[in-house]
Amino acid sequence: MAGIALLAASCAKEATPEKEPITKPQITIEGGRLTPEALWAMGRIGNVAIDADNQRIAYTVSYYSVPENRSTTWVRICDLKNGQLEQTDEFVGSDPAWTQNGQLAYLKGGKLYFHVKRAGQRTEDIVLTGFDKDIEGFLLSPDNSQILLMAEVKTVESTADRYPDLDKATGRVVDDLMYKHWDEWTETAPQPFLAQLDENNIENKQLQVSNFVNLLEGTQYESPMKPFGGVEQWAWSPDGTEIAYTCRTKIGLEYALSTNSDIYIYDVRTRMRKNITQDNLGYDTNPSYSPNGQYIAWQSMERDGYESDENRLFIMNTATGEKVFASRGLDTNVDSYYWKDDSTIVFNGVWHATERIYQCSLHNGEWEIAQLTPDGQYDYEPCGNIGNTYICLRHSMREANEIYQFRIENGQCELNQLTFENKNIYDQIEMGRVEPRWQTTTDGKQMLTWIIYPPHFDPNKKYPTLLYCEGGPQSPVSQFWSFRWNFMMMSANDYIVVAPNRRGLPGFGKEWNEEISGDYGGQCMRDYFTAIDEFVAHSPNADKDHLGCVGASFGGFSVYWIAGHHDHRFKAFIAHDGIFNMEMQYLETEEKWFANWDMGGAYWEKDNAVAQCTFANSPHRFVDKWDTPILCIHGEKDYRILANQAMAAFDAAKMRGIPAELLIFPDENHWVLQPQNGILWQRTFFSWLDRWLKPVVLDPRETKCGETDPNR
């Protein structure tokens, strides 16, 4: 009996109690300016699901606790009445989706739940049973009789599998490429499981799936594709007889070298499949059927290996197989989309550094595009429709995501804000002003640059000024809101920010976007110098003696490169997750297609002029010209650009006698995602900039009157 009691006590000790969910933090902000703590107190609105029949919206919002260093995501259910959202329910979960019968399905802890209304106001959550894997995503068939479940499937033999007697060994034996991806060692692949579902059993308080079929059984292929793909890469036909899914049928070295994914149509009845995009060699992703099943749309890139190719909207007639490049003439990417009705698609795309919502409609046999949202300093993301009312997310450099609705009346867009998630914080702070400025580049072209001014801007004062270098490299400097690279945070610390849409960004035409691959040290760098030089020359408020240069990823590469070419312009540098040594990066990065395309080839290809130019411009080759303090930041779980790049840059600076700091995160990837690490990042960032860019007047008893610290 004593042994049983001891065992019971041991089990009880090992049991981990479920942590209390994080709720909306309450914060009082001193000084009326944005702080790192205020950033992490903000609610973050995510997924939006629309029940058009019942005029309801479900959306997620995440809250963070800095002391507990974790977050909780909540699902909110709201009725849309008279242009306002009335909250009717709230619970912990993610990935909400409405069923045909008006129930709400959602994920929590690797399980799928159905939030069910009972008599009166009572609700109940029914868990799906019969599936023994963690569910990472799901997609219900239109009639709810079938469901696709996303789950990880083991694809690599572990050391313990190979040597059962070495079950505590931590070493890995690797014999092919793609052994790591983004921030994980590749051991599993997400695959779609088709199952039968009887939603009527909800009334009996039970819901079970049966008759599983893994659409990729016996393969190591992914669907959806890692690292960021979700259920948007799957689609049901309206009658539930077909499933369209995205898949790159490659593994190992072949996978690492190619972006050639395809759209496959799986016949639920015969279990046969066909590839409808075999003729296209680049990415084909995110299929979606029209409501009547007459068309299927998807996003398509033309060239294999070019992950930043123009993302085109393609539409195929399901009866004839005729394909149409529907977004031809737009000269920018289609970023996300949905079918509004049988012949209308709503999507967003960036143009001149703002994400806008467009409509692609079939008229007289032709697909025609019209802009829906007005011009302005905002980014929009379409979510769906309730009748003729569009639901979208909107953010800007001055505001995090909020949900909006709009209607088109007499050719005009009438906008209405539905959520006010962070009003309690905005009401306590003053935001900086954002100004667009067109600048003439060294080759005579026009470049749009955002200028962000401090709050309470004094036109008679000079401010230290930062040149911001964007990552990607093919990512737009749009009206984004970041919880790390936040321009309002920089301006709140009394910095002017110069953020150019330099060469190699979408939203200014295909030619502009492509003028960076194979030319990292070329026109894009001249564009950076144009941006800061032109602003300093024409702004009496820019302190030309206290300029800084900051950036992440390709922006970090830019900082390392500029450090060896800036001709004494800058007094401080910060590089986050940047490339320092291009030759090492070519071999270290996991997605080799990117290295081959953007670098132009391998450094051992001596007759390849583009590749040789790329590697000749590696920042590490110009360390002898470094002369300015630099902060190097990196995450050790970053497998896109390894942390040894920052360590090498830091070591080089110290060995050259240049002031330098290194901030390393052992458990962060290409981003910084944990609250306390995020605040450490901000404090280190501004401490470094303030040290070198904000002159401090010394005690007049120790110096001549008005003399400043020469070390600043």
Where in the sequence are the language-model features?
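C-terminal motif of bacterial Sec signal peptides marking the signal peptidase cleavage site
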Residues: 8-10
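Predominantly five- to eight-bladed beta-propeller fold
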Residues: 17-23, 72-73, 152-218, 246-249, ...
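Beta-strand-rich domains and repeat architectures in extracellular enzymes and scaffolds
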Residues: 37-73
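Conserved beta-propeller blade repeats
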Residues: 42-57, 89-105, 132-147, 179-192, ...
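Short, solvent-exposed loop/turn segments at conserved positions within beta-propeller repeat blades
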Residues: 67-72, 107, 184-188, 254-261, ...
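Short loop/turn segments that connect beta-strands within beta-propeller blades
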Residues: 80-83, 116-121, 197-200, 267-271, ...
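Cap/lid segment of the alpha/beta-hydrolase catalytic domain
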Residues: 251, 413, 421-545, 552
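Active-site-proximal cap/loop segments of hydrolase catalytic domains
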Residues: 491, 499-712
